[in-house]
From Swiss-Prot:
This is Protein MGF 360-4L. Belongs to the asfivirus MGF 360 family. Pfam families: ASFV_360. Plays a role in virus cell tropism, and may be required for efficient virus replication in macrophages. GO terms for biological process: taxis. It comes from the Viruses. InterPro entries: ASFV_MGF360 (IPR002595).
Length: 386
């Protein structure tokens, strides 16, 4: 049962009674619990976003309702907790972050499952992944050592998909320096970059500037050229293009990442040589993956190899030929002997850096590509090599 005070706050906020307030009103609003962080609380019923002061729903700092609840629970804001639940926030998110017995008891009174901390943590993490709730997950798990320590080692590594993500999570870090807290942060940050979730990326880049170089590396590795363009040209976060190309080549089927490094000035012949030497690197990154995943990875690296040639890499120079012979790759020797088969693609010869134009160009290339690794011709050549 909600108090008259909470119901009154709900009405006042929903009717935007404080959208125009005087400086003299601030103290009164604070005392009445209608002031949160930098201004009067606002709520958009359409998009379920909680705002503060003059911010809009689309601002990086605005809060989706469940995330606002978690924040209020951390701050032990009793009336706000009740208010956010009244608007429809999921109270079980709140109980995960309750720091005091009083706040935990309040969450239970408002409908939280007392057993949730024992039986619901794993499913909640999976739910947040499926719904791509990056900022909510960060709010719940980051710096929540009690919750992180409640997972045993196997469950924790399973949750963050450690086999698949380990390489990118550990960029710039030594194994012994990585805490669960840092791993969870990087997992969700990487998740946002991978799925091009702009608002979470912008929020996290402001909150964790020490990860700016890692963010650029992750964006290159995952082929998120929108984020690479922003970091490189708007935020002046820079790396040597050849170092970036090494990362781009490590991710299967990464045409966007490889092209962007090429357009920034990376040596495309060197990129081809890197890819042809990737057997050991591939094992290092994916050493624990299953057989069917290995097949897709190998196919993905072949696509990268042919794409580099389409960009102008010369497979017939001595350096490349020596690498092929060192690798004892009969398949590559046969393919690269077909000089008319593998050649630069005319669509890709202009170096452009605007992401929207790059997407169009790559799409045109894929629609006009005459040779790709698993075409009937390629399969026939591979069978001959064997």
């Amino acid at each position: 049962m909600n108090s008259l005070q909470v119901l009154t706050k709900k009405v006042l906020i929903e009717t935007k009674a404080f959208s125009n307030y005087h400086e003299d009103d601030i103290f009164i609003l604070q005392q009445l619990g209608l002031w949160w962080h930098n201004g009067p609380i606002g709520f958009c019923k359409q998009c379920k976003m909680v705002t503060s002061g003059s911010m809009s729903c689309s601002d990086d700092d605005s809060y989706e309702l469940d995330r606002a609840l978690v924040k209020a629970v951390k701050e032990n804001q009793t009336d706000l907790i009740k208010l956010f639940v009244l608007w429809g926030a999921e109270i079980n998110f709140g109980i995960m972050c309750a720091k005091t017995k009083q706040t935990k008891d309040l969450c239970i009174q408002l409908g939280a499952d007392p057993q949730f901390l024992d039986v619901g943590l794993y499913n909640m993490f999976v739910y947040l992944v499926k719904r791509k709730k990056v900022l909510l997950a960060i709010e719940i798990y980051y710096d929540n050592i009690l919750i992180l320590d409640s997972f045993d080692s196997y469950d924790f590594h399973l949750l963050i998909d450690f086999v698949y993500n380990r390489f990118i999570l550990y960029l710039d870090e030594k194994d012994e320096e990585m805490t669960r807290n840092a791993l969870v942060l990087k997992f969700w940050y990487k998740f946002a970059i991978d799925f091009k979730l702009v608002k979470p990326i912008r929020y996290l880049s402001k909150k964790f500037p020490h990860l700016d170089i890692w963010r650029l590396k992750a964006a290159i590795y995952l082929g998120n050229i929108d984020e690479v363009h922003r970091a490189y040209f708007q935020e002046n976060i820079r790396l040597d293009p050849n170092d970036m190309m090494l990362l781009a080549c490590m991710y299967p089927q990464n045409k966007l990442g490889i092209y962007y490094c090429f357009a920034l000035g990376a040596d495309i012949d060197n990129a081809l040589d890197i890819l042809l030497r990737f057997d050991e690197t591939n094992k290092q990154i994916h050493r624990e993956t299953r057989g069917e995943i290995i097949f897709n990875i190998e196919r993905g690296y072949l696509i990268n190899i042919y794409f580099c040639i389409s960009l102008g890499a010369n497979p017939y120079i001595k350096k490349i030929q020596d690498t092929i012979k060192q690798k004892h790759s009969n398949i590559m020797i046969l393919l690269f002997s077909k000089k008319k088969l593998l050649s630069p693609h005319s669509v890709l010869q202009n170096k452009i850096l605007d992401p929207s134009d790059v997407y169009k160009m790559i799409s045109t290339y894929e629609n006009t590509e005459s040779f790709y690794p698993f075409s009937s011709l390629a399969v026939k050549l591979i069978q001959q090599a064997k």
